[in-house]
Regions:
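Domain-length cofactor-binding catalytic modules of enzymes
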Residues: 1-189
Length: 189
């Protein structure tokens, strides 16, 4: 388990390194937030939760259009120094496929560039999750909200989305020549 978790951590770091390298941006103060895992140091299984030791910076995703919250953990012992790992579902994945429509999903994703809005990730649509207000109002015992990030791009890997790719400006090997295109891409969001 520990080896797999170390591999996953390095994988996240490598993806960030590639993104930062290609965009010419820097990662001022990177941090990791892992959910649904076994904390082998503390021997705690965190299902639906993240580590939230006092002072730890954590990221709590809400849903795609609402974006994530960056928080500072409070280390609440009554919660095993854990915090929720996200908004939580209002309905099961199966129910989401039965009840939600692509039209609703597309409408909710307005303003977020995503080449992968298709029926496959319909179960990840914002309507399947609790509202940001509910999370903001209940997170207090475990974490203090520092800020909320505004999403501009979303990619959901599915078995059939090989044609879903970011703009060419995000994929070239010589990214420096595409900075004006990238700036235009981000400024338009």
């Amino acid at each position: 388990v520990e080896l797999c978790q170390r591999f996953a951590r390095r994988n996240r770091e490598k993806m960030a390194e590639i993104l930062l390298d290609r965009t010419g941006l820097n990662g001022e103060s990177p941090f990791h937030t892992v959910h649904n895992y076994i904390d082998v140091d503390e021997m705690i299984l965190r299902k639906g939760a993240v580590s939230a030791t006092e002072g730890e910076r954590i990221l709590i995703p809400i849903n795609i259009p609402d974006g994530p919250l960056i928080c500072i953990a409070k280390g609440n012992g009554d919660c095993n120094s854990s915090a929720p790992h996200g908004a939580g579902r209002l309905m099961s994945r199966a129910a989401a496929f039965e009840r939600l429509t692509m039209a609703e999903y597309r409408e909710q994703m307005t303003g977020i560039w995503s080449p992968c809005i298709s029926p496959e990730p319909l179960d990840e649509s914002p309507m399947a999750y609790k509202s940001i207000d509910e999370i903001v109002n209940s997170i207090g015992p475990t974490a203090e909200i520092v800020c909320r990030l505004r999403p501009i791009y979303n990619f959901k890997a599915t078995p059939h989305n090989s044609d879903c790719a970011p703009p060419a400006a995000l994929c070239t090997s010589d990214f420096s020549s595409n900075k004006p295109i990238l700036k235009e891409f981000f400024d338009s969001r």
